């Protein structure tokens, strides 16, 4: 638990801070060896275990801080609650908060009654634009919920040919849906500044902008893509080094992005081989239009994330890939590009040829498969198609012409055609087995003395499982209980037969 600057006596953290040392990873900077609560009777650690020393240090640290011999449980809980509230980062002025804590006399109830929302930081809002629908959402809202709300807004206010070129304004109802009405003016000003300056650096308290483009295909032509762009905002730039600033594009209106325009995405050949640096070395052929011949005919959304950090030297920024623009501008300087694609599923490997097996024609799957929103359920799509597109049974026995699906099944079957049939044949009853282990297990039946004997009644059994079932008679154990009539059974076969005969209708 990281320490915060707090009152001297009430919070017990005025002179406490973490200092890393060689002997312990986390220790208090103050000397706690003289504290009466820190004098604990720990047995000396002979093995020098670092984990034991660390636990002892933490035990002494918390006893010295909370002082359980002097404070009540409520006082200690209040200290922990206030410390955790300071660690969340929502507090705007920690010093003012500690002053209120001292003024309340370390009483948590009085302290909470005096608190207002003025001590909290303003919420961070994100401007989202998708197919002409715009709204403000909290940065912690899931992306699925954002897309769902924007689709509902689009269905409620579907544009007509007359007003198709007009952008849809952010409504107050959408702000209420995010629970952040109090930051409407600040977020709207930031959105307007973003739309006015495309490709230029951001300044002030402008928020992050999320651009979502979703295209719906016709059954004969094309498949729609969802292109999401998460540029870095000025808020994240303030936390980094001052050597560069962060630039992000504005959300285009419906006039900039026609509804019938083909979706664009990054080609796999245009990404540099050095994936660690994610440096894009090609601008001329950076986009690729997916035609309807290479994309499945059902509707699916693919997610494309493109983050770009610009250096402050060029005056004109690059046009972000994945966002359609009316005209292209020559980019100056260099840019570091982090590209993550969740819609790539390619199969380019040739089928394996197994010598001695039946030949077959196999259709290659080389078209890209776009994953939908529920991409976790679609992940095994490639292996599923590979497995079920081939013939049902591939492996053929050359002696009896039997077909098998797996090689291990064919290998097990071929043992029956071996010349060493004496190893697989029971001498007593002339029964043939596929494995030598099965024959040995079977031969126990023909033995005059059975190896497993009951210690109570000295009855012998050929198998150990039969002995265990027999011993339940002496112990009275009945592990199988019917949940419907509470009858108990000794064996599972008897239990299942009871269910079939008496509780089939239930």
Curated annotation (Swiss-Prot):
Biological process annotations from GO: telomere maintenance via telomere lengthening
InterPro entries in UniProt: SCAN_dom, SCAN_sf, Znf_C2H2_sf, Znf_C2H2_type
Zn-finger segments (C2H2-type): 395-417, 424-446, 452-474, 480-503
Main localisation: nucleus
Alphabetized UniProt keyword annotations: Chromosome, DNA-binding, Metal-binding, Nucleus, Repeat, Telomere, Transcription, Transcription regulation, Zinc, Zinc-finger
GO cellular component: chromosome, telomeric region; nucleoplasm
Tissues where the protein occurs: Up-regulated in blastocyst outgrowths and is detectable in a mosaic fashion in ES cultures.
Subcellular location: Nucleus; Chromosome, Telomere
MF GO annotations: DNA binding; zinc ion binding
Entry superkingdom: Eukaryota
Region (Disordered): 1-24
Coiled coil: none
Limits of the SCAN box domain: 37-119
Function: Transcription factor required to regulate early development. Binds telomeres and plays a key role in genomic stability by regulating telomere elongation. Acts as an activator of spontaneous telomere sister chromatid exchange (T-SCE) and telomere elongation.
PANTHER family in UniProt: ZINC FINGER AND SCAN DOMAIN-CONTAINING, ZINC FINGER AND SCAN DOMAIN-CONTAINING PROTEIN 4
Name listed for the protein in its UniProt record: Zinc finger and SCAN domain containing protein 4F
